[in-house]
């Protein structure tokens, strides 16, 4: 009988718990749910295993406060870190979460150096960079969850605008995971037809698409403003699962993720959202799109924002 993959989730908050539930339902592998708060991962693991019995899932879930339990993990998803609170500057958040990420990275290096690592913790582009540098893992095995989520938001808003199924929509969002992200209408399609062509047919307008692009950029902020006490977790978790499944099943899907660039798009030693192919070796290749001068200018501005954030931790 084939042994299940071992998947460790670092952080047992809303995203961590949702990840565990989705992994269990899809039976992607056995789960280690880690958190520094005693009782929380153990309680959630028990609750999730009991939910699994109803769904017919035989996946094992272990809650723990001991990093040693992640030993030999095939894949690790990291959500540990503080959310940004009212009155907290971006710099404060970077400082606190960098400290947390360094601790996580040291333990990943010690116990699971062969794992494929997906980082979700914000500020994403900085945290995934810290994970790479502190863990010493190869760059093709460390990626950040960003573009899949941003594209899912863009997809939804486009589906609503054109009154079609989300299954008909494919969109592309590049750049940093923040306000300066670059949703690309030219590379986004409805059943293979590019958005600019649909505008020419009179099915939408440039003004409407620009509004959708702005709403996509503020997608996370819109949810934070509505929830008041937290941030999105269902869609971020579902996005990470898409990436995880492509790795575990060698699906070779092309997904937009924060990837470590080494000259692609003219970017060196930074994590930026670009389309990549994910398979059993991790990142198999970076897909380099041909950008117009205007798109490249927006992309470069987004990269500059990431660069400035990285400078704050050096």
From Swiss-Prot:
GO terms for molecular function: L-lactate dehydrogenase activity; L-malate dehydrogenase (NAD+) activity. Its EC number is 1.1.1.37. Keywords: NAD, Oxidoreductase, Tricarboxylic acid cycle. NAD(+) binds at residues 11-16, 35, 97, 120-122. It holds the Pfam family Ldh_1_N. Substrate binds at residues 84, 90, 122, 153. The keyword Protein biosynthesis does not apply. It catalyses: (S)-malate + NAD(+) = oxaloacetate + NADH + H(+). InterPro entries: L-lactate/malate_DH, Lactate/malate_DH_C, Lactate/malate_DH_N, Lactate_DH/Glyco_Ohase_4_C, Malate_DH_type3, NAD(P)-bd_dom_sf. Belongs to the LDH/MDH superfamily. MDH type 3 family. This is Malate dehydrogenase. It comes from Rickettsia conorii (strain ATCC VR-613 / Malish 7).
